[in-house]
């Protein structure tokens, strides 16, 4: 999940510039996504998440462990692993954009809180893209126990990192 977890903060750090929706509005008169979703943020977030995944692949191939826990393999071979580590951050950011689209439809402005949805949108997106790209790998690695752990720990990690982002000036809201 690290490539997915890292994509959003790096999108925020390196983002800015032209909004993906080009300032256009939907048929309800509201912005499609808003100014917070930019091409630079999307591509930098995917790139940084992918790079983190490549580092994990490299460490895994060398038998690296943290406190006795082996690094994930991400696939049976290098090409398969690269597909997974590209799907995770891509799905995370598209999940975040999907959520933004629906928040705009609900009349919620950029930065408005939508509890649990704000914390889990990128997980759902990452899982969806990864399942589409590598279904066998997904099913064998995201067991019920792992999935529950991710769903419980992610809101806590998300809140912690957003508070840090708020205090260092990267985020305008601490959620």
Curated annotation (Swiss-Prot):
Its EC number is 2.7.7.67. The keyword Lipid biosynthesis applies. Signal peptide: none annotated. It is an enzyme of class 2 (transferase). The chain crosses the membrane at residues 41-61, 78-98, 122-142, 150-170. One of its GO terms (molecular function) is CDP-2,3-bis-(O-geranylgeranyl)-sn-glycerol synthase activity. Its cofactor is Mg(2+). One of its GO terms (cellular component) is plasma membrane. It is a multi-pass membrane protein. It is found in: Cell membrane. Pathway: Membrane lipid metabolism; glycerophospholipid metabolism. It comes from the Archaea. One of its GO terms (biological process) is glycerophospholipid biosynthetic process. Keywords: Cell membrane, Lipid biosynthesis, Lipid metabolism, Magnesium, Membrane, Phospholipid biosynthesis, Phospholipid metabolism, Transferase, Transmembrane, Transmembrane helix. It catalyses: 2,3-bis-O-(geranylgeranyl)-sn-glycerol 1-phosphate + CTP + H(+) = CDP-2,3-bis-O-(geranylgeranyl)-sn-glycerol + diphosphate. NCBIfam families: PRK04032.1. Belongs to the CDP-archaeol synthase family. Catalyzes the formation of CDP-2,3-bis-(O-geranylgeranyl)-sn-glycerol (CDP-archaeol) from 2,3-bis-(O-geranylgeranyl)-sn-glycerol 1-phosphate (DGGGP) and CTP. This reaction is the third ether-bond-formation step in the biosynthesis of archaeal membrane lipids. HAMAP family: CDP_archaeol_synth (MF_01117). This is CDP-archaeol synthase. It comes from Methanosarcina acetivorans (strain ATCC 35395 / DSM 2834 / JCM 12185 / C2A).
